[in-house]
Amino acid sequence: MSSCVSSQPTSDRAAPQDELGSGGVSRESQKPCEALRGLSSLSIHLGMESFIVVTECEPGRGVDLSLARDQPLEADGQELPLDASEPESRSLLSGGKMSLQERSQGGPASSSSLDMNGRCICPSLSYSPASSPQSSPRMPRRPTVESHHVSITGLQDCVQLNQYTLKDEIGKGSYGVVKLAYNENDNTYYAMKVLSKKKLIRQAGFPRRPPPRGTRPAPGGCIQPRGPIEQVYQEIAILKKLDHPNVVKLVEVLDDPNEDHLYMVFELVNQGPVMEVPTLKPLSEDQARFYFQDLIKGIEYLHYQKIIHRDIKPSNLLVGEDGHIKIADFGVSNEFKGSDALLSNTVGTPAFMAPESLSETRKIFSGKALDVWAMGVTLYCFVFGQCPFMDERIMCLHSKIKSQALEFPDQPDIAEDLKDLITRMLDKNPESRIVVPEIKLHPWVTRHGAEPLPSEDENCTLVEVTEEEVENSVKHIPSLATVILVKTMIRKRSFGNPFEGSRREERSLSAPGNLLTKKPTREWEPLSEPKEARQRRQPPGPRASPCGGGGSALVKGGPCVESCGAPAPGSPPRTPPQQPEEAMEPE
């Protein structure tokens, strides 16, 4: 699919503060998309190649950039390049890297102060209660919309996709891009994730269509690795059911077998990631506690729904308009049965991986413990602005995660309670590592009982994602050939193959198996008639049939036709068959 993006270079987009921050999306900076001229010449393919995802927009400030950030981080916190041949480009709507302190000088608990210095994408939009992140998880969720057809229209400066107008590119990942999308029906901005199906399969090394969607447990309870297509459908099936203030919402999925992309529409969490790593301006302890409490409630909800996120990191924690965190990017998440997930594959961001997932001897490990480790690394990043284990070489990074002792920098000076919590979360032994219920009661988290977290019953409402829902997470319209075939069968009142010859066969209802079909006979021939009698009834005329015997036959795919004269005197009248009833073997 061709789309229109800003003509301004990526490196220049972070400079002017008022171009996008206060004036909304600059349409003057856009130019007509040259690729739109070729939309009419696109060939139609029945196979799917791309995906698009759309999320609900919270009008306000900032941009949700992490929806497309599925790139891993280096040990120093920088993102690893996906492809050396591709230039490092990231379309940002905000000017430069902004820490959360720069966004919220008034303290973490004040949502109004958090919005004072935020970057405004759409200042002219009115506040929409439907997009408010303050909605309770107990409230009935608006169901995710599944569109069976995608209509793409090329406009002068943008692309119209059903009711969505695609605007600037606000993020970029390894499998697609994230675009700002405006919904004409509800006057709301969303984040539309556009995924290329061909690129998903090509980068994963699949030469042809992968196995059916969904993750199936292997013997022993561990989860088998999934291909990228299966991961996308798993993410869709999971997100369709989740409804929590600290989890990003999936609004709509657009998919057409004749299109090359899948479109996922998410809510636009407008202030973007909680922080950039590394940063020279980490969060204060009060700010870190405020966001970490949100993270605990979100992870508890996911584990309650039997979901392991597997990629918790600051760039996947988005700040909403009320200043609270929403967990995003479920691309590598796993479902489990029972009390915990038993995992065997290694996915996620290298600097946030647990040591047991990197072990050469341990084959199966706990999924909940992986999320707790990543939460500990994230909390470390909150207060120190960097990861606890860093190295430019991936193998050295793995070695440090597995064997190097945890150390705390001298500055900034943090409380002993916080050091104790981080140390217990980054315990290299998953069996002795602290668990989420214990984290909720830790003195640093609750400020020694002054700020208790809600109970599990108050925070969680169980939803179930069945295997059938994973298989049917995105429904597709039937192809034109299938529609024509069904209409032909209805018109002929027959549900046999309408393109095969109308060869009639009689069936014996009492015969089993292959004996159900009896050899057809000509209606005008007796069942038992001497050969001499049949020869006497042979009409006069040239016998030009090379097939042997009278009548017509199919030899090597073509009919063998005889010239028929008048019946012989005294012979019974002959009723020729209307069509070939039986293919006779050639002599």
From Swiss-Prot:
Enzyme class, first EC level, given as a word: transferase
Catalytic activity: L-seryl-[protein] + ATP = O-phospho-L-seryl-[protein] + ADP + H(+); L-threonyl-[protein] + ATP = O-phospho-L-threonyl-[protein] + ADP + H(+)
Enzyme Commission code(s) on record: 2.7.11.17
UniProt GO BP: CAMKK-AMPK signaling cascade; protein autophosphorylation; protein phosphorylation
Binding site residues for ATP: 170-178, 193
Post-translation changes: Phosphorylated by PKA. Each isoform may show a different pattern of phosphorylation. Autophosphorylated.
Regulation: Activated by Ca(2+)/calmodulin. Binding of calmodulin may relieve intrasteric autoinhibition. Autophosphorylation does not alter activity or regulation by Ca(2+)/calmodulin. In part, activity is independent on Ca(2+)/calmodulin.
The keyword Glycoprotein is annotated on this UniProt entry: no
Regions of compositional bias (Basic and acidic residues) in chain numbering: 520-535
Positions of the UniProt region annotated as Calmodulin-binding: 474-499
Pfam family name, one: Pkinase
Main location: nucleus
UniProt keyword annotations, A-Z: Acetylation, ATP-binding, Calmodulin-binding, Cell projection, Cytoplasm, Kinase, Nucleotide-binding, Nucleus, Phosphoprotein, Serine/threonine-protein kinase, Transferase
Region feature (RP domain): 203-225
Compartments reported by the entry: Nucleus; Cytoplasm; Cell projection, Neuron projection
Residues with N-acetylserine modification: 2
Biased composition, class Pro residues, residue ranges: 569-579
Record-annotated active site: 311 (proton acceptor)
Main function: Calcium/calmodulin-dependent protein kinase belonging to a proposed calcium-triggered signaling cascade involved in a number of cellular processes. Phosphorylates CAMK1 and CAMK4. Phosphorylates CAMK1D. Seems to be involved in hippocampal activation of CREB1. Efficiently phosphorylates 5'-AMP-activated protein kinase (AMPK) trimer, including that consisting of PRKAA1, PRKAB1 and PRKAG1. This phosphorylation is stimulated in response to Ca(2+) signals. May play a role in neurite growth. Isoform 2 may promote neurite elongation, while isoform 1 may promoter neurite branching.
Domain notes: The autoinhibitory domain overlaps with the calmodulin binding region and may be involved in intrasteric autoinhibition.
Similarity section: Belongs to the protein kinase superfamily. Ser/Thr protein kinase family.
Name of protein: Calcium/calmodulin-dependent protein kinase kinase 2
Organism expressing this protein natively: Rattus norvegicus
Lineage: Eukaryota, Metazoa, Chordata, Craniata, Vertebrata
